[in-house]
């Protein structure tokens, strides 16, 4: 989860209060080494579980500075869950701080979202350099799962130019699926539900389902 807890808040609605009042979040697992099983929450989707973030995670990087093997804490937390779940998704903030480094160290692969805007391209090289360092120092098995175009509007020339540029550079690593601009994607979090439950027929929901299928097919 991101430090702001946005992913957890949008993926669950029945247990919103539980998340806000939960005594065990990913923060406690990282800082206090709480049992990760105690942090797992059910959702309205039977096969989907979440681990909530906490606002305290914003300052966790400072608390982690004096901890041993601080770059590998999240990996140690999540390793017991690997045999229980087909996929574990770690939602990261855009910043390349210690929490994100922990996520990249724990991950098997990374999905790189690219907003269909010019300035989004500037951050890619920095992220790729970080991934290169992580691979050489902390996680040799880390791979790029793919580049995902988001906030895409095919009517805009710039969006198509960005897509073509990313495709030219990264070729087969670019997902065929794009996440289009869709009002339902911005509405759903305000109701505390994932888009697939808010409006399964919306463009945003269909885009995410297509992405899920593409990821599954890539990993067969």
Model-derived segments and their meaning:
Residues 1-220:
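P-loop NTP-binding core
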